[in-house]
Regions:
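Class I (Rossmann-like) S-adenosyl-L-methionine-dependent methyltransferase catalytic domain
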Residues: 1-31, 37, 42-92, 110, ...
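Conserved acidic residues
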Residues: 34, 99
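A conserved beta-strand element that flanks and buttresses the S-adenosyl-L-methionine
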Residues: 102
Length: 223
């Protein structure tokens, strides 16, 4: 079951902590400083980090409590962050505007077709040389077997649970081909050059009891 993040982010503590995600910390500085977009930003840990690097950041999250917390932290730290409570699927990404677009732990909560639309819009929204950074969960994640047993699989790797929540887990190489279709179809025009791609098991100690995830990371540079 998908957690109630509106309620979680409404608490005083930072659920994910104050430190940025490892992939943003590792690759954020490789993007040319300019406008950045954080899709599904949560409480804004990556948005705040990028603003600290000098980016002018727009963060989008469905939760009002997450947005409120991010804006308060940005005010206290005097950082350039604009945060909006909105459905990322309906947010219109301006073309050729951003130096970096991030979607960290977003795509597991969307049908894969909708994730693909966001990826396509993000690629169009990047300036030449800009970076697209995303992270999600793979079929090696324990949630995959759990959903296979208890949820309805409405598309390969995408499940509808008993509460009506969507959960998607990505097969080997799937995110790479979604971001860089030239790897699945040699006739497809390349728009991103992969900078980093990894699938791995991750022991998560950042929130709640320690647990395992199957993770996929992708970083691509706009050609």
């Amino acid at each position: 079951m998908v957690k109630n993040y509106e309620e979680i982010y409404g608490k005083d503590e930072l659920y994910w902590g104050a430190a940025p995600s490892e992939i943003i910390k590792r690759f954020g500085e490789l993007a040319p400083v300019g406008a950045a977009l954080d899709l599904g930003m949560g409480e804004g840990r990556d948005a705040l980090y990028l603003a600290g690097l000098g980016f002018s950041v727009t963060g989008i999250d469905a939760t009002k409590s997450g947005v409120s917390k991010c804006l308060e932290l940005a005010r206290k730290k005097e950082l350039d962050v604009k945060a909006l409570s909105a459905d990322v699927r309906k947010f219109k990404i301006a073309k050729n505007r951003y130096s970096l677009i991030a979607a960290i732990n977003l795509f597991q909560f969307l049908p894969k077709a909708e994730a693909q639309k966001i990826i396509n819009s993000a690629i169009a929204g990047l300036k030449r040389g800009g970076l697209f950074v995303c992270e999600s969960f793979t079929v090696d994640d324990p949630h995959y077997k759990a959903h296979k047993k208890s949820s309805k699989e409405i598309a390969p790797g995408t499940f509808l649970d008993s509460s009506g929540n969507i959960y998607s887990l990505y097969d080997y190489g799937e995110i790479l081909k979604m971001c860089c279709p030239q790897f699945g179809n040699t006739k497809a025009q390349a728009q991103l050059r992969p900078v980093h791609y990894a699938e791995y098991d991750y022991y998560d100690t950042t929130h709640g009891p320690a647990h395992w995830h199957g993770v996929v990371d992708f970083v691509g540079k706009k050609l």
